[in-house]
Amino acid sequence: MEIPYNVELRKDTGLYNAKLGIWLFLASEVMLFGGLFSAYILLRTGAPLWPPIGEQGSIIHLLKDTIPHATFNTVVLIVSSVTMVMAWVALKQKNLSKYKMYLGTTLICALIFLIVKYFEYSHKIHEGFVPAHDTYMAIYFTMTGLHVLHIIGGVFVLGYLWGPGIKMWNSEPERFTNRIEVAGLYWHFVDLVWIFLFPVLYLLN
C-alpha cells in the first residue's frame, strides 16, 4: 500500500506533510544535541580547571593549532547553507541547470568540511588525544563525531537529489521542490549545530 503524498498545505498546521515531518524530526534532534550541550556545561562548570588538569597545557596548545581549521570549516558550512537556499530558489524559478550548480557547490562544501575534519581528527589522534584521554576529549569526539555523522547523512541525501533523484523533476516538479526545501531545512540545522559547537569546543577553552 502506497502512502499518498500531498503537496497541499494542511489546514491545521499550514504546512505540507513532509515539512511538518522534518520539523518534528528536527525537534528530536534539538533534544539530542541539547542533552549533549547540557552535559558539557555541567562537566565544565563542575571542573576546577578546563580542560582537565594533567595535560592541560598540551590540550590548549592543540586547540589553538586547530582553531584555523575549525574557522575555515565554519565559513565552508555557512557558504553551503547559502548555496542550499539558492538551489531551492533556482527550482522555484524552474532553472534546473542553476539548481544543479548550486546544489553541487553545497556538496563540494560538505566534502571539504569532511576532509578538513579528517585531518583534524588524525592530528589529534597522532598526538595521543583520543576519546579515552580525558573528559574533554571524550565529549569533544562525541559531539563533533555525531555532527560529522549528520554531515555524512546529508551528503548521501543531497547527492541523491543532485543525481538519480532529479528524475522526479520531470514528472512531479512541485513535489521535487518540496523535497529540496525539506532537505535544506535539515542541512541548515546541521550547520546551526556547528555554529554552536565551534565557539563552545574551540574558542571558549
Task: Locate predicted features.
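...captures the hydrophobic TM-helix bundle architecture rather than a specific catalytic motif
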Residues: M1-N205
